[in-house]
């Protein structure tokens, strides 16, 4: 068995004296592990870092075997990502989200969103908006997608500012006003198609976004598996909070 594909490194662990087991999210073969000979060496360390993009060639005698990788760098992001706390936490959290996907099951949209998110980590606000969208995409890919296209009560597609915590559907301003204290806030950048790039956010939008996705991830995905939110998610949100406070302190 043999294939070649684009991939992003999610994690690496040492195996024996000199090898490493590398976990990739690939474009066409999903989340996939393989062994890299000499992967524990100092020469390979810069390449085998989470967030780096590679061209991966995988080979095994049988499809169900772990197999061996040969990896070639296509984009080395790790050195830049390690330069900011929000990026370090963000990459770790993205990897934990990708691990919610079944192994060896292709999820090309998730792969593309991961690339988009990793390439926009320079700006903490844009990175946060992308990460929230990534969490929404994970929910959808696992069968728990939110319906943010129209009001669940009236069918209206305008003034969608709430989300029902029960159904995961959008609610308009007028329909939700009597129950606003029980509803989740829908951030502007999630209801504006033009904000796909991640722009147009406010600090409150970001916190509302993480509250929204966090609620449904915990209830529908994590708790049924006996899991909770990653420490890296909390670290990322704390780093964003500190970054938002800096201008006021200067």
Curated annotation (Swiss-Prot):
The keyword DNA repair applies. Pfam families: RecO_C (PF02565), RecO_N (PF11967). GO terms for cellular component: bacterial nucleoid. GO terms for biological process: DNA recombination; double-strand break repair. The keyword Acyltransferase does not apply. Disulfide bonds: none annotated. Keywords: DNA damage, DNA recombination, DNA repair. InterPro entries: ARFGAP/RecO (IPR037278), DNA_rep/recomb_RecO_N (IPR022572), NA-bd_OB-fold (IPR012340), RecO (IPR003717), RecO_C (IPR042242). Gene3D superfamilies: Nucleic acid-binding proteins, Recombination protein O, C-terminal domain. Involved in DNA repair and RecF pathway recombination. Belongs to the RecO family. This is DNA repair protein RecO. It comes from Rhodopseudomonas palustris (strain TIE-1). The gene is recO.
């Amino acid at each position: 068995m043999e294939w070649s594909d684009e991939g992003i490194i999610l994690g690496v662990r040492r195996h024996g004296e000199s090898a490493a087991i590398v976990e990739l999210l690939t474009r066409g073969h999903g989340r996939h592990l393989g062994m890299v000979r000499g992967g524990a060496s100092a020469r390979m360390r810069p390449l085998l870092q989470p967030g780096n993009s590679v061209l991966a060639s995988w080979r095994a005698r049988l499809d169900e075997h772990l197999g061996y990788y040969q990896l070639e760098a296509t984009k080395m992001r790790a050195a830049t990502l390690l330069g900011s706390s929000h990026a370090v936490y963000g990459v770790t959290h993205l990897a934990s989200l990708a691990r919610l996907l079944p192994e060896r099951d292709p999820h090309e949209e998730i792969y593309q969103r991961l690339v988009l998110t990793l390439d926009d980590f320079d700006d903490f606000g844009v990175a946060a908006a992308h990460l929230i969208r990534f969490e929404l995409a994970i929910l959808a890919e696992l069968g728990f997608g939110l319906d943010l296209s129209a009001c669940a009560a009236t069918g209206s597609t305008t003034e969608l500012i709430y989300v029902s915590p029960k159904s995961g559907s959008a609610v308009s301003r007028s329909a939700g006003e009597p129950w606003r204290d029980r509803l989740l806030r829908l951030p502007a950048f999630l209801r504006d198609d033009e904000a796909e790039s991640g722009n147009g956010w406010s600090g409150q939008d970001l916190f509302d976004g993480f509250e929204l996705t966090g609620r449904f991830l915990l209830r529908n995905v994590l708790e049924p598996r006996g899991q909770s939110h990653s420490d890296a998610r909390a670290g990322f949100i704390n780093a964003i909070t500190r970054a938002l406070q800096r201008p006021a302190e200067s």
